[in-house]
């Protein structure tokens, strides 16, 4: 067999160690230093299964069973299971409580994985309206309109799905309003918290939520792939139905899900999560400061204003203008940031970009702001 494996040796990554990373998809998944030591204990394949009696969520050593109970309290739900990510959590709900051909009513900012999950479950969808440019906010009342439309057309509705915070604009949807609509109409309500649970406080019961899909690697300071599905006890029998052949195994979990480093890193980071969501107001303040400081340069923040989440999307005509005369063209901004020890902005992008300063210190935030100011002022 002629295979050269040298390229797989000594693989390194210096973005997090040597640079300030502004990538929104990564800011919430950074593991705290004190939690990293657990990796050395559990990096072997089935290391969490030393004392397993048949199911991941029932393991007592390490205390996965207690952790999941505590996580339910943290999210304001009844029962929690580990998954491989928010997309798998959504699919587990759709595949268990909906019938083939049912409709999922979901928001216009829904993540692509919501569509992939419902397609895989052989479901249909009805998309609700969102505000036009530049806010793109979810319109809660549109849910009632779409539900009425489907009911009048004799279409079966299986699920109401809302993206709590979308990844495109970082808008925080009005969950309580949509939850009240779902409850009044009598439909189960799934909240996609991939960009919220673990970053900001969540209380599923207060929000009238039946299911929460969370992402460990995106927003809960965990190694990937790792997610959580939290449910109300009302849906326990449907979502957590067990196999007729292997009676201890839950069907939607395919027996066991995220095992090894992903689930253990999430457990080790739990104390960190509990403390950091208490400081959410400070994260919002930092984000608003970035917007207020950079907009006078010629950046235009799109999405709801003022910011209520750490994701920032800027239109940047000033960068596009500089790119026209700079010999590096669209790569100049990436390269100038890299010189200053800043990464996470896509290479070659000048018309618009997304960023986040979640978890950065005030000193780091000021450095990012001043670095972008210096780039614009030097090259404009």
From Swiss-Prot:
Biological process annotations from GO: translation
Enzyme class: transferase
Record-annotated disulphide pairs: none
Gene3D superfamilies given in the database record: Aspartate Aminotransferase, domain 1 (3.90.1150.10), Type I PLP-dependent aspartate aminotransferase-like (Major domain) (3.40.640.10)
InterPro entries in UniProt: PyrdxlP-dep_Trfase, PyrdxlP-dep_Trfase_major, PyrdxlP-dep_Trfase_small, Sep_Cys-tRNA_synth_arc, SepSecS/SepCysS
Needed cofactors: pyridoxal 5'-phosphate
EC number: 2.5.1.73
Stretches of the chain forming a coiled coil according to its record: none
Quaternary structure note: Homodimer. Interacts with SepRS.
Matching NCBIfam families: PRK09331.1, SepCysS
Protein name: O-phospho-L-seryl-tRNA:Cys-tRNA synthase
């Amino acid at each position: 067999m002629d295979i050269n494996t040298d390229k797989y040796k000594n693989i390194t990554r210096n973005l997090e160690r040597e640079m300030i990373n502004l990538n929104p998809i990564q800011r919430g998944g950074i593991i705290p230093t004190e939690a990293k030591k657990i990796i050395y204990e559990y990096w072997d394949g089935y290391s969490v299964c030393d004392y397993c009696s048949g199911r991941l969520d029932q393991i007592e050593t390490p205390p996965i069973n207690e952790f999941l109970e505590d996580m339910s309290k943290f999210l304001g739900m009844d029962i929690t299971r580990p998954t491989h990510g928010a997309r798998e959590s959504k699919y587990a709900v759709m595949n268990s409580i909906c019938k083939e051909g049912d409709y999922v009513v979901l928001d216009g900012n829904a993540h692509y994985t919501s569509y992939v999950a419902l397609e895989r479950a052989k479901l249909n969808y009805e998309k609700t309206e969102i505000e036009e440019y530049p806010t793109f906010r979810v319109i809660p009342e549109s849910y009632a309109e779409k539900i009425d439309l489907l009911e009048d057309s004799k279409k079966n509705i299986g699920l109401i799905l809302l993206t709590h915070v979308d990844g495109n604009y970082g808008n925080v949807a009005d969950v309580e309003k949509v939850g009240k609509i779902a409850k009044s109409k009598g439909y189960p309500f799934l909240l996609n918290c991939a960009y919220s649970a673990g970053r900001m406080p969540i209380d599923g019961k207060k929000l009238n939520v039946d299911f929460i899909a969370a992402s460990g690697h995106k927003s809960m300071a965990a190694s990937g792939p790792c997610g959580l599905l939290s449910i109300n006890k009302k849906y326990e029998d449907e979502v957590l139905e067990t196999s007729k052949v292997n009676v201890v195994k839950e069907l939607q979990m395919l027996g066991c899900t995220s095992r090894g480093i992903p689930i253990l890193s999430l457990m080790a980071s739990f104390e960190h999560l509990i403390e950091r969501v208490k400081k959410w107001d400070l994260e919002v303040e930092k984000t608003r400061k970035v917007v207020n400081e950079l907009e006078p340069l010629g950046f235009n923040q799109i999405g709801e204003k003022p910011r209520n989440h750490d994701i920032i999307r800027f239109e940047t005509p000033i960068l596009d203008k500089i790119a026209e005369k700079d010999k590096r063209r669209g790569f100049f901004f990436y390269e100038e940031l890299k010189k200053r020890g800043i990464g996470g902005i896509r290479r070659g992008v000048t018309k618009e970009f997304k960023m986040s300063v979640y978890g950065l210190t005030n000193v780091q935030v000021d450095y990012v702001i001043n670095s972008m100011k210096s780039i614009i002022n030097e090259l404009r």
